[in-house]
Design a protein with these regions (language model features):
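Glycine-rich, proline-tolerant flexible connector loops at the mouths of alpha/beta enzymes
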Residues: 43-65, 80, 209-220, 310-323
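Conserved, mostly hydrophobic/aromatic
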Residues: 4, 40, 48, 65, ...
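Active-site mouth loops of central-metabolism enzymes
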Residues: 12-27, 79-86, 179-189, 280-291
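An alpha-helical appendage that flanks or caps ligand/catalytic pockets
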Residues: 129-174, 207-208, 215-307, 340-353
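Hydrophobic faces of well-ordered beta-strands that scaffold small-molecule active sites
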Residues: 4-8, 44-46, 74-77, 104-108, ...
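N-terminal beta1-alpha1-beta2 module of alpha/beta enzyme domains
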Residues: 1-72, 348-353
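Flexible, glycine-rich active-site loops centered on histidine and acidic residues
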Residues: 2-22, 83-154, 213
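Alpha-helix-loop-beta-strand connector modules within alpha/beta enzyme cores
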Residues: 55-79, 327-341
Length: 354
């Protein structure tokens, strides 16, 4: 692990209920990101959910964070592509990349089970697959083509153009265009097959907080096997650059009596169940003193395999509580795992060792 950041689910209270409002959650996300940037934390990432009291429109938030910070990477974990116009998303992603000077890590995927029944249809999109997998895949392919500069339209006849700027029939690409943006796109994967496809697509891997598979070994072992399969597929595809891999974990350093009171019962083991009609293994949560956490995370095969760790945080507890979690991890645990703070400059990721 060379880099770590926080992953916020952006929870807020329904209208009329106690707790942070939607406005509070957005402003607190910006404030926490600024504080994390000052600590040298490498990334601020946000999950996206629709029809729920959670973060739903990431681009304005990411742009605000990027404008207020100097080093921290801003990203998503993940954007649900069933809800997206891929060309509009390409425009927004390129503009964000330029605002952030390349400090972007946009995770995307088919999305998770949600509160709405085929909610993407309310946004004007249709899918053959009841879970929308075909829609997400088509949107991802078109998005990747758009950010690479592939023509998406052609210039109108001269009498129909305003202003007149192109010869009729000239191929037109999506603008703005941000060079190298594809290397900052990630696919959120829960299966070995989707991890291998991400490698063939030439995008980074964001391994989920669960795996849609069961088998021998722990959640961490299953996830590490997916990462290994991704890296083998990447090597076979012959891409010319080294990708990144992230995993997400809930980690609560117990530094005080208050920490033990708030998070002491958060520790849990792996769980096996069913999600989205698939056998699923859910990862454990870590809550212990720093020495124990270091030992446990060093033994986590997926954390050891990844270069980036995303700490899932209870954002509804507010800035101070979450900054304490992040700061304690940065001070007492991350250095023992190989962390390189952003204050030391851009990360150079090791070539694949396969």
């Amino acid at each position: 692990m060379k880099s770590f950041g926080f992953l916020s689910f952006g929870h807020y209270a329904p209208a009329g209920r106690r707790g942070p409002s939607g406005r509070d959650a957005l402003h607190q996300a910006i404030e926490l990101s600024v504080a994390a940037d000052e600590l040298g934390v490498n990334g601020a990432y946000f999950r996206v959910h629709h029809f729920a009291n959670q973060a739903a429109a990431p681009m304005p938030l990411l742009a605000a964070v990027a404008a207020r910070t100097r080093r921290i990477e801003v990203g998503t974990g993940v954007i649900d592509l069933r809800y997206e116009n891929p060309l509009h998303l390409a425009e927004e992603a390129a503009a964000l990349d330029q605002i952030a000077d390349g400090r972007v890590a946009l995770g995307m995927s088919r999305g998770a089970p949600e509160i709405a029944q085929r909610g993407w249809e309310a946004f004007g999109y249709r899918a053959e697959d009841p879970r929308g997998a075909d829609l997400a895949r088509a949107n991802f392919e078109r998005f990747l083509a758009a950010i690479e500069g592939a023509p998406m339209a052609q210039a109108a006849p001269l009498g129909e153009q305003y202003p007149t700027s192109c010869a009729p029939g000239t191929p037109l690409r999506i603008l703005p265009h941000s060079e190298g943006l594809r290397q900052r796109i990630w696919w959120g994967s829960g299966t070995t097959a989707s991890a291998q496809r991400a490698a063939r697509d030439g995008v980074n891997l964001m391994s989920s907080t669960l795996v849609l598979e069961t088998g021998q070994g722990s959640f961490a072992d299953l996830q590490a096997a997916q990462i290994a399969a991704y890296r083998r597929a990447w090597k076979e595809a012959g891409h010319s650059w080294t990708p990144r891999v992230s995993v997400s974990r809930s980690v609560f350093p117990l530094m005080s009596e208050r920490d033990r009171r708030l998070y002491g019962l958060a520790a849990s083991g792996d769980q096996v169940g069913e999600l989205d009609q698939s056998p699923t293994t859910f990862g454990r949560a870590y809550a212990a003193d720093p020495d124990t956490l270091v030992r446990q995370l060093q033994q986590d095969a997926a954390v050891a395999s990844a270069d980036t760790l995303l700490l899932t945080i209870p954002n509804q507890l507010g800035v101070d509580a979450n900054l304490s979690i992040i700061e304690n991890f940065a001070r007492c645990i991350a250095p023992e795992l190989g962390w390189v703070p952003s204050t030391r400059g851009p990360q150079e990721h090791d070539p694949l060792l396969l």
